[in-house]
């Protein structure tokens, strides 16, 4: 599905009722994006939404307000960690992951973030290319980190002071 404009939302809210619905919506979007590899439960997402150190950046289709993409980060002091990024299958291959991460990195650079770290499966070439395009550098690996298929984890890092 082609998208020309998406609404960005920082997924923090003070209303507990909204947090629960947002957790359900985020879980449904993650499940749709990662139907075979979903390690985040709705309860874990709900807890993250209530955690002051966790930040969700949401992309919604303005036509139907459906969550079509999201990125989940943790910010502690000046260190940012990307836990998850997901784009629904029908919305992929349009540069939305790049746009979503670019917005989030700009936010963190303006809000005391100095360095971003993430982990990705070594076989996930599309994600690795995305991170490298956004100036992330590989700094380490964890051999056989993922128990199901013994894939390696690749650790990337980016200094937010650097320009893309």
Which ranges hold each PLM region?
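Acetyl-CoA-dependent GNAT
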Residues: 2-90, 101-103, 107, 159-163
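Conserved acetyl-CoA-binding loop-helix of GNAT-fold acetyltransferases
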Residues: 87, 93-106, 110, 128-133
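Short glycine/proline-centered loop/turn elements that form peptide/ligand docking sites
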Residues: 97, 101, 123-127, 144-149
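Conserved GNAT acetyl-CoA-binding A-motif
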Residues: 108-119
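Conserved catalytic-core motifs of GNAT/GCN5-like acyltransferases
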Residues: 119-120, 132-153
């Amino acid at each position: 599905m082609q998208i020309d404009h998406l609404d960005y939302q920082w997924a923090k809210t003070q209303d507990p009722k909204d947090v629960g619905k947002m957790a359900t919506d985020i879980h449904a979007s993650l499940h749709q994006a990662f139907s075979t590899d979903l390690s985040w439960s709705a309860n874990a997402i709900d807890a993250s939404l209530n955690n002051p150190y966790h930040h969700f950046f949401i992309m919604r289709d303005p036509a139907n307000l459906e969550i079509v993409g999201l990125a989940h980060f943790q910010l502690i002091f000046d260190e940012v960690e990307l836990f998850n990024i997901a784009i629904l299958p029908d919305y992929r291959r349009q540069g939305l992951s790049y746009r979503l991460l670019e917005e989030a990195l700009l936010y963190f650079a303006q809000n005391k973030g100095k360095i971003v770290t993430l982990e990705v499966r070594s076989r996930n070439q599309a994600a690795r290319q995305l991170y490298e395009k956004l100036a992330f550098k590989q700094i380490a690996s964890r051999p056989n980190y993922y128990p199901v298929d013994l894939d390696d984890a690749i650790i990337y890092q980016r200094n937010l002071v650097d320009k893309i």
